[in-house]
Amino acid sequence: PEMSFEIVSINKFIQFYFCVPRELKEFVEGQFYAQYPTVEISAADDYTEKIFEEKYAVGYDVQTTKEDVYPIKTFQSFEVDPLSGITSVLSQLSANEEVWIQICVSPASDQWQKKATSFVKAIKSGNDPNEPIWKTILGGLGTIAKTVSAPPTQTASAPTQVDISGPAALAMSGIETKSTKLGFKSKIRVISLSGDYHRARANAGSVAGVLKQFTQTNM
């Protein structure tokens, strides 16, 4: 099933929405109450169905720049709640401006976990998995030094030993940690509305900028 979680600023008022299958409604509500005991949840009309007059809309989809086995930053990596950066941008909008941020998720199969596990094993053993991601790690994560040694009495080469350090080691650790979690297919969309095109574009850019805080720059 697909679920949608949204952060919206309308008339200088920041609101949070979620849309899930009816059979998951109570479960999802329970998750919110567990984390935020004082939260108030109620049914709401679809804010996207209203008529917009004399407003410009600028929108885009957010995509990762690396293969999906790589992790993004999660809340454990932040000293300050990353949500505050997003709400700070939304709080600066004018009364006639709006920004919608939508995150659509649906459960993913275990194939991505198998891909991550196979990738890490291949790198550690010195084998080339013959995948584009292998080129990514070589080109973007630093040099992987290979030390090959063989007994002097044998003509066959011994198994390759791979020394991994620096950003590559951090990447391996991050990929291994991520592969132990449940996975979701996700899509992030952003729409900015304003009576002025340049303001709509600028607000959309501000949201894009704050979303970059989830990038793992050391990988």
Task: Give, region by region, the residue ranges found by the protein language model.
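Extended, folded cores of ATP/NTP-driven motor/assembly subunits in large transport
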Residues: 1-219
